[in-house]
Structure formats: structure tokens, C-alpha cells
Amino acid sequence: MSRSGAAAEKADSRQRPQMKVNEYKENQNIAYVSLRPVQTTVLIKTAKVYLAPFSLSNYQLDQLMCPKSLLEKNSNNEVACKKTKIKKTCSRIIPPKMKTTSSKSESTLQNSASAVHTESNKLQPKRTADAMNLSVDVESSQDEDSDEDITPGLDDFSGLSPYERKRLKNISENADFFASLQLSESAARLREIIEKRQPPKSKRKKPKRENGVGCRRSMRLLKVDPSGVSLPATPTPPTLVADETPLLPPGPLEMTSENQEDNERFKGFLHTWAGMNKPSSKNTEKGLSSIKSYRANLNGMVISEDTVYKVTTGPIFSMALHPSETRTLVAVGAKFGQVGLCDLTQQPKEDGVYVFHPHSQPVSCLYFSPANPAHILSLSYDGTLRCGDFSRAIFEEVYRNERSSFSSFDFLSEDASTLIVGHWDGNMSLVDRRTPGTSYEKLTSSSMGKIRTVHVHPVHRQYFITAGLRDTHIYDARQLKSRGSQPLISLTEHTKSIASAYFSPLTGNRVVTTCADCNLRIFDSSCVSSKIPLLTTIRHNTFTGRWLTRFQAMWDPKQEDCVIVGSMAHPRRVEIFHETGKRVHSFGGECLVSVCSINAMHPTRYILAGGNSSGKIHVFMNEKSC
């Protein structure tokens, strides 16, 4: 009976359910441990530990200290409270025989887990709810055998795997190594040395501001020297007056010579004009000469010192030869508003030069009247057009416009009663001398930005040609409108600005233009239609620069198939070209030492006059005419 009862009791003990306690053991990444005991049926004796990986890469030097200091520094009240509760719970559940073994494991595991607890909180602060349940199955009959000793000091971790025990050993060794380096003590000593070397900071005393003195200013602006003495006042520079000559008063001006003091000689000169107040009966309608005879006459023209005259003080802008057959009179317009007249028949030659001042700015255009040879008309940049009457010794005002600047003019009628005037701003004016006053009859604008020259067709006088900025237009005076006029024909072959454009003097069948692209162009204008063809392009250096008057190719009034133009070549010369482009003749000599930009030929006699930029005229003439 006793044996059977013992066997039954032993079988009941095997079938009796055993209690499994979730014992709190500090391990890596343990953030929460359940304190509620769980009853489980234990079939075998097992010990299970769930581990989570972690890293020491985020540890700082002051955190890698000895395990004892780490435990004191990183343990908090929450862990202590949880440990106390677990101990109380386990004491009620674990038998006395089992407490001895559990206390040893708990104390050792607590030390290692507290060191990892800080790292777990830093790496995964949000995962406090993820806890690992460490369950230990305790049998009713616990063996007295102790765990194997693998590593000294780790006897209480016999339930861990060899990897975990090696890992805890490495943690302990690393902590001991960093503790032996004494980094905290070295850092403290270095900090003390740095603080000792820093000089004491001294507070800078702000200077007291003197009463009445504001912001600091330079002595130059205060106009004082370094000693504080005021400097003398800087002399003010003289005011620069604009280089503009005031306009002459409106109305007629008395004709007085600026370079002749002998009034009796000047009066005698004026009386000689009485016999020249009628136009010459000779004309040039007999036809053109042959090129051979024309060249022979040109070869007979010479220059000498007696035919070089100093007339004006500034550059010559315009020139005209009187059509007289008996006297040789050359008129020039200069830069400073002067009009000079040179009588080549007067001896000595200084007595034959007379200079007048009817304008205040450059005289850009000059003509003797075709109806009255005793009249000379001059146009200036100052916006005035005057007529000099030598029989009355007076300069009458024909047209005045102070708001505009004139560039050129020509006669629309043979009796010189109506004029066409070109403006520098591209406008054009019709002027009738028979109308009282000094105003225009019609003012019209053109599509040209600037007008340099105006020339009327010699036969069909209703047509006139204008030259300007890359444009050459032919207009009909009968179709001019106040609101703007459109040209009949435009010559568009030019690539740069055009200095001049002139019809041939007898028939008007040709047009010659002088362009800044170093070309002379001759057009066929025999039929004024929608297009005027280009006949010839003559290569010629027209680049005069800033200080020389621009070249203007002119037709020879006796030979309308030949043009006269100045030259930049050396030695200095004046050249004549045929309309085919061939050079007919070249004027030169020892007395010609400058560039003659403006040239004029006598309408019936073989006399050529050229003006330069110093106010001199050079006259080439036949020896019989000298």
C-alpha cells in the first residue's frame, strides 16, 4: 500500500500544473517587464532569453565609464520601482530553495542590463512599449547543480548563450579601457589650461562726446588743416561759356568789309558792279565739246602763287564763281558766318579780297542770282537766308527760322523768285521772295532724317533731288504737302551717308552722288520714272576725317558728262572723271599743298577754284586769262 500510494503521489506530482513566472531580468533593449504572474504548464526544464540587437556607435566618451558609474548615472527611479515590485512578486511565488539561485542571476543580470538600458532609451525612445518577456520555467524539484563557469565574474549568467556572455565581457573590457585612459581628467586639465591662458577681458571705456560735435567728419570736408586752422576759400573756376555765337538781328544788314580800312577803295569796288547787273548774253547751248578738245583746254590751266588767296579765317564750306566774262570773281562761304569775295583782276591781290559777316554760323550754300549777277544769296546753319546786293551795299533777309537750321537751297524758278530750302532735321521749305516778310510759303517734312543738299532739275524745274542719311530722293514740288511728302523716286544703292547729289547742269540726264563709302555713283535720270538705273560706280577716297570739309562731286557746267572732286591722294590734286568712270584730268602743282574739299568751275571759261579748310582758295586758269 505504501509503495502504491507513493507511486500515485509521484504521478500526481508530474501531472500537477507548474507555475511560470515572468521574472524581471535586466537585458538589452528591455524597456518594460510584465509584473503579472502567468501560470503555465512546464513539461521540461528550459531557459529562454529573447535578445534584441543594439549598437554603441552613438555613445559618447563620458558615457563609456565603468559599469558601476554607468549604473549610478543611467539608472532612474522608474527602473528601481519596477525592480522592487518584481522582487516582491517573485518572493511570493518562488520557493525558498529557488530564491538563492535566482538572486544570484538577478544581481549579475541587473548590473549588465542597467548599462544597456541607457543605450536602448537613446536609440529607440519611441519603442518603450515593445518589451521582451523573459520567462523562466521553474520546476518544483530544482537541482542543486550550479551553472558551468565559463568566464570569471560571469558565473551568474550561466543561463545565457556563449555569444551573450562574450558580448558582456567585451562591454566590461571596453569600459575598463576607457576608464584607464582618464579622458575626463585630461579634458578637465586642458580646460583649466585654456581658461588660464585667456587674458582678462577689459571693458573699453567709451569716450565722452563733446557737446556740439556730432558725427565724425574729415578735416577736408571741414576745410581745416591738421592744426585746426581754417583753410582759405577755394577759388571758383571760371564759368565756361558755350561756344555759340548769338544770332544777328533780323532785317537788312549794312555791307561793310571787315578787312578793308580804305572806304574809298571799297566804294570803287561797289561801283564796278553797276555794269554787271545784267546777265551775260553768252550761253552754253552750243553743245558739248569733245573729250579730246576738253582735255586739251584743261591741260592749259595752271596755278601760281598769284592765284592763291587767303580769304577767310575758318574752313571753307561753299563756293561760287561769278559768270562774268570780263572779271574773275570768286565767292566763298566760311565756317564762322563769313562771306568772302575775291577779285582776281585787282592788283596787288591783297586789295582784291573783301570779307563780310552776314551770318553767325557756317555758310553751307552760296549762289549768284541767275536773274541779277549783282546779287549773291547765302544760306547758313543759323537759320537765315540773305541776299547781298552789291549795287546797294546791303544784305537783305529773305528767309528766317530761328527754330531750325538750314543746310542747302536752290532756285525753283529761273528768275530766282522761288526757292526750295533744305533743313538739317529733314524738313523742306518753299520760299517766295515776292511775298512780303521773311517766312515760308509751305513747310513739309520728309522721310529723311537729315538733308545735306538740295538741287533742282535744270530743265524740269518742278523736280528736285535731296541727299541725306543713306537716302537720295527725288520730289515733285507740286505735290509737297504740309503733313508730309512722299518722294517720287528713291536711289537705294548707297550704304552710308551721302554728302551731295546733283543733276547734270545742261539736261539733267545724269545724277552724281558722293557717298561716305568711298564711291562716286552716276545714275541715268533721263526719264524720271519709278526707277533710275545706276550707270557707273567710281572708286574714290572720300574719307576726309574730322577736320576737313566733306567732298562734294560737282558737274562741270560746260561739260556735263564730267565731274570735279577733291582728292586725298599725294601729291595734292583735284581730279576730273568722265561719267564712264575714266579719269580725264588731274590738277596739281607746287602751289597746291593742301586738300581742296570744295571746288567750282566757271560756267563759260576754263577757270577752276578750290577751297581748303584753312580759308585759302587755289585758282587754276588759262594763261591767257591771267
Curated annotation (Swiss-Prot):
Chain positions covered by the region annotation Disordered: 1-20, 97-161, 194-213
* Origin superkingdom: Eukaryota
SMART domains membership: WD40
Its recorded name reads: WD repeat-containing protein 76
Q: Where are stretches of biased composition, namely Polar residues?
A: 109-123
How does this protein assemble? Interacts with CUL4A and/or CUL4B.
| Acidic residues composition bias: residue spans | 140-150
The gene is WDR76
UniProt keyword list: Repeat, WD repeat
Where are its TM segments located?
Answer: none
- Biased segments, Low complexity type: 97-108
The task this protein performs is described as: Specifically binds 5-hydroxymethylcytosine (5hmC), suggesting that it acts as a specific reader of 5hmC.
What is the organism of origin for this protein? Answer: Papio anubis (Olive baboon)
For this protein, the record's Pfam families field holds: WD40 (PF00400)
Q: Name one GO molecular function term.
A: DNA binding
Q: Which biological processes are named by the entry's GO terms?
A: DNA damage response; regulation of DNA damage checkpoint
* Family statement drawn from the similarity comment of this UniProt entry: Belongs to the WD repeat DDB2/WDR76 family.
Q: Where is the composition biased (Basic residues)?
A: 199-208
